[in-house]
C-alpha cells in the first residue's frame, strides 16, 4: 500500500494555518521522481505572524508560562514529545524515507535519535534550575554576585534536508529546553517530518507560539526570518554560501548566529590497519545517508604501502552495497534528494574526469534503476590538490583519494582545506592516533571509525565549516544568555563622594 503524505498547513501559534498567499510546493519522491503530495509555502507575511506568536508566547503571564517557568516544567513537554515520536517511529521513518531518499533502516535510526535528543534536553532543562544564582567569588567583601541563565528570546532555526527531523531536533530541543520560543524553517526539499513534529507538539499540548513551523523556500521564508528585527538569534545548518548570507543579514542588527556549514572531511588510513575494518569505515564515512552528510569523510588519504590492496578491497565493499528504493529491505544506498542535486553530483564527476582524475568505481546511474535520482558509490583516484573534486563539497556518494608516505605528509593533505568540520584517523597505533587527532584542524575527530554522533557530545566545525557548537551542554548554551547580578551588602555608605550632610 502506498504511504499517504498527510496534508498539512503551517503551524503557527499552536494551530494549523493556511499560508497568507495560499501557495504550496510539490513533494517529489526521489526514488520514483513522482509527486506524492505538497507542503505549504510560507512567505514574509507568514513569518511576521509567526514572530508575533513567538513573542507573545514569551511574554504570556509575564514569562511565567514558558521563558521563566522552572526547567522542570519545560522538561515535561520535551519528554512528552520524545514519547510521542517514539510511539510513531515506524510511520515517521517511512515518511522520512520517501521524502528525502534515506534508506528506511537509517531513517528509523534517525527517529530513535530524535526521541533520545528530546529526552536528553529534558534532563538538561531540569538541571538548569540548580544552575540559577550560581555564586561568584569576589575580592571585595562589600559585594556579593551571582549568575542567572536566561533564554536568549525568539530564535529562528533553519535546517537542511539530509536529516530533516533529526537536524531540526538538534536545534528545537535545546532551544525549548532553554526557554526560548522558536520558529523552525526546514528545507523545502524535505519538510514532511517537521510538519509531523508540529502535529506531535499539538497533541502533547505545547503552549501556543512556543514552536512555530514554517515550510517554504529559502528566499521567501528563510531570508525574512533571518533578517527579522524581532528574532533574537539565528541557528543555521546548510551550505557555506547560504551561511554567509545569513551572517550578512544578521550583522545589520548585530544579531548572534551559530552556523554549521559545509565540509570536505579527510579520513587518514595508515598501513597497519585491518584492511576490511578500515574499508568498511571508509565506505560508511562517505556513503551513509547517500553521501549527503556535512561531515562526510569524502577525502581518503591512504598510505602508499597499502593503497592498491586497500582500494581493490574498498571497490569490493562498494559493489556489495545494496542500491534500491529506500523502502526495500536491506537498502543501504538510496537516491540523492532531488533532480538538481543529482545533476550537480554528475557534473562534479565529469569535471574530475576532465581535469585528469580517474573514476575507479561507480560514477553513474546504477543499471538496474531506470528511474529515481540514484548514483552509484563512486571512487575517484589520480587526484591532485588543485582539482575541484579535492577542494569543493560534493554532498553525494563520491570519494576522492590521495596517497601519502609519512605522517607529516598525511596531515598536510588532511588540513589542506578551507573546511574544518570532521576528520578521521585509522591506525592500530593509538599513540599515533592521539598525535594525529590533536594536529587535525577539525571540530570533530574520529579514531578508528567515521561518523558516529551522540547528542551528549559537541558538534561543530572550524574555518569555513562555521562556528558555535550544537549538542551536549554546548547546544543548550547556544540558546542561553548569562546575566550577572551584583549586590552591595555592606551597611556602610560607599563613601566615594563627600556627603552633602557633612558640608
Curated annotation (Swiss-Prot):
Cell location: Peroxisome
Protein task: Dehydrogenase that catalyzes the oxidation of several aminoaldehydes. Metabolizes and detoxifies aldehyde products of polyamine degradation to non-toxic amino acids. Catalyzes the oxidation of 4-aminobutanal and 3-aminopropanal to 4-aminobutanoate and beta-alanine, respectively.
Enzyme class: oxidoreductase
Name of the protein described by the UniProt record: Aminoaldehyde dehydrogenase 2, peroxisomal
Annotated source species: Malus domestica (Apple)
UniProt catalytic activity: 4-aminobutanal + NAD(+) + H2O = 4-aminobutanoate + NADH + 2 H(+); 3-aminopropanal + NAD(+) + H2O = beta-alanine + NADH + 2 H(+)
Gene: AMADH2
Gene3D superfamilies associated with the record: Aldehyde Dehydrogenase, Chain A, domain 1, Aldehyde Dehydrogenase, Chain A, domain 2
PANTHER family registered for this protein in UniProt: BETAINE ALDEHYDE DEHYDROGENASE, BETAINE ALDEHYDE DEHYDROGENASE-RELATED
Residues forming the catalytic site: 260, 294
Amino acid at each position: 500500500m502506498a504511504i499517504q503524505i498527510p496534508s498539512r498547513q503551517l503551524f503557527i501559534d499552536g494551530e494549523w494555518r493556511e499560508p497568507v498567499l495560499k501557495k504550496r510546493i510539490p513533494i517529489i519522491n526521489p526514488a520514483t521522481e513522482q509527486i506524492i503530495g505538497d507542503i505549504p509555502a510560507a512567505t514574509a507575511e507568514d513569518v511576521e505572524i509567526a514572530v508575533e506568536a513567538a513573542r507573545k508566547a514569551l511574554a504570556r503571564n509575564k514569562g511565567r508560562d514558558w521563558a521563566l517557568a522552572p526547567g522542570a516544567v519545560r522538561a515535561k513537554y520535551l519528554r512528552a514529545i520524545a514519547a510521542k515520536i517514539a510511539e510513531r517511529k515506524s510511520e515517521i521513518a517511512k515518511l522520512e524515507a520517501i521524502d528525502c531518499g534515506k534508506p528506511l533502516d537509517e531513517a528509523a535510526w534517525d527517529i530513535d535519535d530524535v526521541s533520545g535528543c528530546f529526552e536528553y534536553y529534558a534532563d538538561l532543562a531540569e538541571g538548569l534550575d540548580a544552575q540559577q544564582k550560581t555564586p561568584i567569588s569576589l575580592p571585595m567583601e562589600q559585594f556579593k554576585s551571582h549568575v542567572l541563565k536566561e533564554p536568549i528570546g525568539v530564535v529562528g532555526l533553519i535546517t537542511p534536508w539530509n536529516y530533516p527531523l533529526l537536524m531540526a531536533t538538534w536545534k528545537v530541543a535545546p532551544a525549548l529546553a532553554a526557554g526560548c520560543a522558536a520558529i523552525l524553517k526546514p528545507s523545502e526539499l524535505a519538510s514532511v517530518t517537521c510538519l509531523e513534529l508540529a502535529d506531535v507538539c499539538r497533541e502533547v499540548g505545547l503552549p501556543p507560539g512556543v514552536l512555530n513551523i514554517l515550510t517554504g523556500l529559502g528566499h521567501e521564508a528563510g531570508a525574512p526570518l533571518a533578517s527579522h528585527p524581532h528574532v533574537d538569534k539565528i541557528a543555521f545548518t546548510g551550505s557555506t554560501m547560504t551561511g554567509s548570507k545569513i551572517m550578512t543579514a544578521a550583522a545589520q542588527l548585530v544579531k548572534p548566529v551559530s552556523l554549521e556549514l559545509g565540509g570536505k572531511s579527510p579520513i587518514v588510513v595508515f598501513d597497519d590497519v585491518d584492511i576490511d575494518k578500515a574499508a568498511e569505515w571508509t565506505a560508511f564515512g562517505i556513503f551513509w545517508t547517500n553521501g549527503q552528510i556535512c561531515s562526510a569523510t569524502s577525502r581518503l588519504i591512504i598510505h602508499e604501502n597499502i593503497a592498491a590492496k586497500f582500494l581493490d578491497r574498498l571497490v569490493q565493499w562498494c559493489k556489495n552495497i545494496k542500491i534500491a528504493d529506500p523502502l526495500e529491505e536491506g537498502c543501504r544506498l538510496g537516491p540523492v534528494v532531488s533532480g538538481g542535486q543529482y545533476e550537480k553530483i554528475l557534473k562534479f564527476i565529469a569535471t574530475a574526469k576532465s581535469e585528469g582524475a580517474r573514476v575507479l568505481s561507480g560514477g553513474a546511474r546504477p543499471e538496474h534503476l531506470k528511474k529515481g535520482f540514484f548514483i552509484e558509490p563512486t571512487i575517484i583516484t589520480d587526484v591532485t590538490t588543485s582539482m575541484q573534486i579535492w577542494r569543493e563539497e560534493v554532498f553525494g556518494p563520491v570519494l576522492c583519494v590521495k596517497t601519502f608516505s609519512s605522517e607529516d605528509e598525511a596531515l598536510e593533505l588532511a588540513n589542506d582545506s578551507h573546511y574544518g568540520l570532521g576528520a578521521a584517523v585509522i591506525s592500530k597505533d593509538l599513540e599515533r592516533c592521539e598525535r594525529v587527532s590533536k594536529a587535525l584542524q577539525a571540530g570533530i575527530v574520529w579514531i578508528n571509525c567515521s561518523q558516529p554522533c551522540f547528542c551528549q557530545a559537541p558538534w561543530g566545525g572550524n574555518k569555513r565549516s562555521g562556528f558555535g557548537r550544537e549538542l551536549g551542554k554546548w547546544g543548550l548554551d547556544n540558546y542561553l544568555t548569562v546575566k550577572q547580578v551584583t549586590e552591595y551588602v555592606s551597611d556602610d555608605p560607599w563613601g566615594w563622594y563627600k556627603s552633602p550632610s557633612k558640608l
